[in-house]
A protein has these predicted regions:
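Glycan-processing catalytic domains of CAZymes
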Residues: 32-415
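Acidic/polar N-terminal loop/beta-strand segments that form early-domain functional surfaces
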Residues: 11, 49-51, 137-139, 426-427, ...
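A broad structural signal for short, well-ordered beta-strand segments within beta-sheet-rich domains
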Residues: 23-26, 39, 268, 456-457, ...
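Compact beta-sheet-dominated domain cores in extracellular/mature segments
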Residues: 416-507
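N-terminal export signals
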Residues: 7-28
């Protein structure tokens, strides 16, 4: 298996531009939906790898799965498979690597997806940041990775049910030689049972399943069109709503797409073209809007297919993110197109550096001398949860909850102190931050609407002359604390106020 999730072919912008077809672009108002809103239509879906393991975590794979090139040895500068370094402060268990200490002097440790608390933390982040549905990636489970991947499916189900997120199985056909028979066998014998979960995604009343990799012009996906069509139709015959993770240029059958696969693509209920490695700036996003996305939507409309294009944050290590401007432009453009859903590529893809999950915000949280870039790589400070917050706002715009705007409304760092009261997830004003709160009374619901989750806050900044009275219960009940100055550490208060805030009054 390759070290990155998938092998990508460079897309030629010039070729794509030459292939644009006059008269195929549709406005959002002219793009009818093939399906009504469900668990993928009208929703923000995130691709979830869940494929990291560490020596000593108890996973059957028994190694540093996807963290290092040689899984038998801990990751180090010479044995590295990471494109970005995660912010690990929210995990209860982490594992020592062979990297030098972080810039802040702390040991360089990584999380394991095999720990249930890790998966729970990720799904809690999804809950807090408007990620409706998670697509669990499932590569060939018939080899040595199978037992660990089976365990991850169970862990994802548990987390999804705990945090109220929908999930579905997303098969990846890469390097799967006996895919035609084994994918059907795996669904029948193992994965279909997960559709009994109340949190398993349904669309049009059918359980959702995705197949990624059909039609790609790559040697490790050389499945004949007839085989691909057989598998798609088999899943549809099982009563599934089938999504196709297809090449970028599926419609024209060029570049990353093999020719002669259009019947395969049109057999899917929803099409989700891949975008990682295709754009690196706002101009690239606009090019695809003008020359690809609108034409894709028109084709999907003509064939009654739902359209779920990818949104990428950008490769952090290559400097593509533009502190969120690249990602926001895609949210803006695709909302204008009138797409039926959006697929975030990816939630936890630290290998390719295209993750939205919490990431090292500065050199203080990256191993010294590693060369791994932090979120502030272009000189703009960003909080570790910035791309989660950006995804939340992009989803709100897509759903019509905030106005359509080309101007990114999400600040890379939430300003604190002068504009209002700001609560923080961690002590010392670290981690995620809520919105700056004006004077007034805030129930649990009001705080949550401002990004302050229940029993979540660990520190607060308070403007001079302001007073905050915090309560441990909703509607200003329970234990109360009154502050008229910044509080950097709720654990030091008497009584302890850490993770206790449920409502508050600000005057």
């Amino acid at each position: 298996m390759t070290l990155t999730r998938r092998t990508f072919l460079a897309a030629s912008a010039a070729t794509a531009a030459a292939a644009s077809t006059a008269g195929t672009a549709l406005s959002a108002s002219a793009a009818p939906q093939a399906s009504p809103p469900g668990d993928v239509v009208g929703k923000i879906t995130v691709g979830y790898q869940g494929w990291f393991a560490c020596a000593g975590d108890g996973a059957p794979i028994n190694g540093w799965w996807h963290w290092s090139r040689n899984w038998g040895q801990p990751p180090s500068p010479s044995n590295n498979a990471l494109g970005s370094w995660p912010d690990v402060r929210d995990y209860s268990a982490t594992y020592q690597t062979a990297y030098a200490n972080l810039g802040n002097g702390q040991p360089a440790r990584l999380f394991s997806s095999y720990d249930q608390q890790t998966v729970n933390t990720h799904f809690q982040w999804m809950q807090q940041h408007g990620c409706d549905t998670a697509a669990l990636q499932r590569f060939n489970p018939f080899g040595g990775e199978g037992p660990t991947r089976d365990a991850m499916a169970a862990k994802v189900r548990q987390a999804a049910e705990q945090y109220g997120r929908k999930f579905y199985i997303m098969y990846d056909a890469t390097d799967w030689q006996n895919m035609q028979s084994e994918m059907k066998q795996d669904w029948t014998n193992k994965m279909r049972a997960y559709t009994a979960s109340p949190m398993y995604a349904k669309q049009n009343g059918k359980p959702v399943v995705c197949i990624w990799g059909f039609g790609f012009n790559e040697p490790n996906k050389a499945f004949p069109a007839s085989v691909c069509l057989d598998v798609v139709n088999w899943f549809k015959g099982q009563g599934c709503y089938v999504i196709g993770g297809v090449p970028t240029h599926w419609r024209r059958g060029v570049e990353d797409s093999r020719s002669g696969y259009l019947d395969v693509y049109h057999a899917f209920d929803m099409i989700s073209p891949w975008m990682v490695g295709r754009i690196q700036d706002v101009a690239g996003a606009d090019h695809y809007y003008n020359n690809v996305n609108q034409q894709d939507q028109a084709d999907c409309n003509a064939f009654g297919i739902d359209y779920q294009p990818c949104v990428i944050p950008g490769d952090l290590q290559s400097g593509h993110r533009r502190h969120g401007d690249l990602m926001w432009r895609q949210f803006y453009n695709l909302t204008r197109v009138g797409v039926q859903g959006m697929y975030i590529s990816m939630f936890d893809e630290y290998n390719e550096g295209n993750q939205i999950a919490k990431t090292a915000e500065s050199a203080a949280f990256v191993p010294s001398g590693s060369g791994i870039r932090a979120l502030d790589e272009d000189g703009t400070a960003c909080s570790s949860d910035y791309y989660l917050r950006l995804t939340n706002d992009g989803g709100r715009m897509f759903k019509g909850q905030i106005p359509l705007t080309p101007n990114r409304p999400t600040p890379p760092v939430v300003s604190a102190g002068t504009g209002g009261v700001v609560f923080f997830e961690h002590v010392d004003y670290l981690g995620a931050a809520g919105a700056a709160l004006a004077k007034g009374n805030y129930t649990r619901a009001a705080l949550q609407a401002a990004g302050v989750q229940d029993n979540w806050a660990s520190s607060v900044r308070i403007p001079a002359g302001w007073t905050v009275t915090a309560y441990s219960e909703d509607n200003f009940g329970g234990q109360a604390w009154t502050w008229n100055a910044n509080q950097p550490n709720f654990t030091t208060l008497s009584p302890n106020a850490n993770d206790q805030l449920t409502s508050c009054r600000i005057s």
